[in-house]
Amino acid sequence: MVKNYDSVEFPYCDEVSKYERLAKIGQGTFGEVFKAKHRQTGKKVALKKVLMENEKEGFPITALREIKILQLLKHENVVHLIEICRNKISPTANQYNRCKGTIFLVFDFCEHDLAGLLSNAHVKFTVAEIKKVMQMLLNGLYYIHRNKILHRDMKAANVLITRDGVLKLADFGLARAFSLAKNSQPNKYTNRVVTLWYRPPELLLGERDYGPPIDLWGAGCIMAEMWTRSPIMQGNTEQHQLTLISQLCGSITPEVWPNVDKYELYQKLELPKGQKRKVKERLKAYVKDVCALDLIDKLLILDPAQRTDSDEALNHDFFWSDPMPSDLKNMLSTHNQSMFEYLAPPRRRGGHMPQQPANQARNPAATNQSEFDRVF
């Protein structure tokens, strides 16, 4: 779908000086993200910098891909690209240098990201509010997948939420169009995508012909995180991440994942054997809702062919049983400050369970660190 990058629509770019930068709210390999406001209207926006210095052949293809995808996607639960701006160009710049400098993607401003909210102990989600978060997240995934787009970087920091409680999938810097394999020729997408803690087992094993299930695995990790308040599998390496996945989701074998032994890495890596699936058992100390546990379990299925998709997930009993999904606006209205992962203290990592919610008794079985490596 997103093939012809010549059709990217930005024949004229305004200068970014029309916006006043207010604060830095994000940092990554791509550059920086700033909160800003339009100098004339006062409208708040987010400015995402696209670094150009190292591009010897014009505009970076990854940025072109992101822009094209963002222009294609128009949905309430997907971040909205307003325009593209640039730094002021010198009057003496030649045609080559006019393509250099810094480009900014301008987005509608969202007050929070989910990682920032979960980092704040004063932010407490009810089950009904968690249902609303996941319903919006899955609606966004359903829409992008229906439009043949993979996000490829699902994580809590890339889930934005406005002050009015509207969720937006964000950061399409790794996104790409996908298609079914043609003429028995498998796709050869890169598997070096998705932040390690949210990366599904098929990518860790080297799969290059993948599809929407990679994003649903990330959705499952995020859903569990709504209760645990920190990423549930925090590996240090790809091998370690596969070990943690095996300890939570059971040993990776052809019995539970047909043809998994086709992967060269499956033969090379020493993965844990004899591990039983413990998703529900390990999470029940945090997640008291039976339907929620069942949906998380279905999203974290090892075999991508058996993993639930966004349509099935949205029809799950979790969303259609009491309490019904509830608006986030009232809860968020009690918090005046924006919350972003970049501005929050480092989230708990490695060696310890995340803090147990005050109203939940800790399950001794779930804290026996002698039996398993770091998972939650």
UniProtKB/Swiss-Prot annotation:
SMART domains: S_TKc (SM00220). Keywords: ATP-binding, Kinase, Nucleotide-binding, Nucleus, Serine/threonine-protein kinase, Transcription, Transcription regulation, Transferase. It is an enzyme of class 2 (transferase). Residues 19-319 form the Protein kinase domain. Gene3D superfamilies: Phosphorylase Kinase, domain 1, Transferase(Phosphotransferase) domain 1. Associates with cyclin-T to form P-TEFb. Belongs to the protein kinase superfamily. CMGC Ser/Thr protein kinase family. CDC2/CDKX subfamily. This is Cyclin-dependent kinase 9-B. It comes from Xenopus laevis. The lineage of its organism: Eukaryota, Metazoa, Chordata, Craniata, Vertebrata.
